[in-house]
A protein has these predicted regions:
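Conserved alpha/beta-hydrolase "acid-adjacent" motif
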Residues: 199-206
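Catalytic nucleophile-loop/oxyanion-hole region of alpha/beta-hydrolase
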Residues: 63-65, 85-119, 237-242
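Short amphipathic alpha-helix adjacent to the substrate-entry channel of hydrolases
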Residues: 64-83
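Short beta-strand/loop motif that positions the catalytic acidic residue
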Residues: 191-194
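N-terminal cap/lid segment of alpha/beta-hydrolase-fold proteins
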Residues: 1-45
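Short beta-strand element of the alpha/beta-hydrolase
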Residues: 47-56
Length: 280
């Protein structure tokens, strides 16, 4: 993703990168070479929307399989191109991981023709800490946190839309975190959800409450479930309401696509359904 020797924003003082590892259950640690894994739809659509997925893990690790690959495979089956991020973690300053996301958005746009995705329909999605990272990406509104390094950075780093699943760190002691406050003024479409049994519920609820108090409310769709603890992801429990949130997400994506004449409605028809008994 970054040209050799040109990756911006180095390690924090007295930190070492270590070696990247992935456990048998898909927990990734020690990311020092950021990048993303590509999951392209196979349904023959001329173009598709694209979602850059930021797994959570409290910035100490990445729940890469459950909140990354599993979500990507689900979107892929439904005709949406998905890209799972490996971003730099707490050994690096916060701007490092934000730079990784911005670079990824520009990289995907620069390869939109190759991957058959619409450059105007490339969004970001995050779980937990990854949701905070996605929200920070919205807040900076495409303004890069690093100096452009090549022609890839001529492409926009602004997400077309953003989704946050049980996002964390939007608030701090009851106040909106400075890192996301500017997102109240965005024109980016947003989708958020959380379970009200989640210890981090105040993050999503607090941000949504702030949106409702704005003179010009952002375009945000929010869903709150009376059940659901932190970390439910795309689940194998299809009969529990909180585990069917992905239907709502796909309906929202389809609505965005249908409002833009540059994407044919026929090409987005697959976004209207998820197979019954979906288990990934």
């Amino acid at each position: 993703m970054w040209p050799e020797g040109k990756m911006p924003i180095g390690l924090n003082k007295n930190q070492t990168a270590g070696e990247e590892t992935e456990s048998p259950n898909g927990i990734v640690k020690g990311v020092s070479v950021p990048g993303f894994e590509v999951f392209l739809p196979t349904n023959g659509a001329k173009r598709s929307m694209a979602v850059l997925i930021c797994p959570g893990g409290a910035y100490g690790c990445l729940d890469y399989d459950r909140e990354g690959r599993r979500t990507a495979r689900f979107l892929q089956k439904c005709g949406v191109a998905a890209f799972v991020m490996k971003y730099r973690l707490r050994q690096y300053p916060p701007k490092a991981r934000l730079a990784d996301v911005q670079r990824s958005l520009s990289f995907i746009r620069s390869n939109a023709k190759k991957w058959n995705v619409s450059p105007d329909h490339i969004g970001v999605m995050g779980y937990s800490a990854g949701g905070h990272l996605a929200m920070c990406t919205v807040a900076v509104d495409g303004k890069r946190v690093y100096e452009p390094i090549d022609e890839i950075d001529n492409q926009s780093a602004k997400p077309s839309f953003a989704a946050f699943v049980y996002g964390a760190y939007f608030t701090n002691k009851g106040n909106i975190s400075p890192s996301v406050k500017a997102a109240f003024n965005t024109d980016i479409r947003m989708f958020m959800l959380t379970g009200l049994a989640d210890l981090y519920r105040f993050s999503t609820v607090g941000f949504f409450d702030g949106c409702t108090k704005m003179e010009k409310c952002p375009k945000v769709e929010a869903h709150f479930y009376p059940e659901g603890c932190h970390g439910f992801s795309v689940s194998t429990k299809p009969h529990n309401d909180v585990y069917r949130w992905e239907r709502l997400l796909l309906t929202w994506l389809r609505r965005i696509a249908s409002e833009d004449s540059s994407v044919d409605a026929e090409e987005c028809e697959y976004l209207s359904m998820i197979p019954e008994g979906q288990d990934e």
